[in-house]
């Protein structure tokens, strides 16, 4: 999962405006992980999908693929939520 930091710290109070963290622009979470077997990758995808469904207010768009790589498989998945707050909740729930 990737998280981009766009926050700019205020020099007067060492704080950050919430609008710089949640600006509504990043509603997607990308997952790229390696597993020994396709069954392991499918189990994780099922768990992530369930978490996404529990987080969504409007349907989350989920795209995924499992590709064979040397010594295993790679899970590539994209979860696009209706708002950035849901994407952040999903990311935090998977840490």
Curated annotation (Swiss-Prot):
Record's protein name: UPF0381 protein HI_0400
Origin superkingdom: Bacteria
GO CC terms: cytosol
Family in the record: Belongs to the UPF0381 family.
Species in which this protein is naturally found: Haemophilus influenzae (strain ATCC 51907 / DSM 11121 / KW20 / Rd)
InterPro entries: DUF406 (IPR005272), UPF0234-like_C (IPR035571)
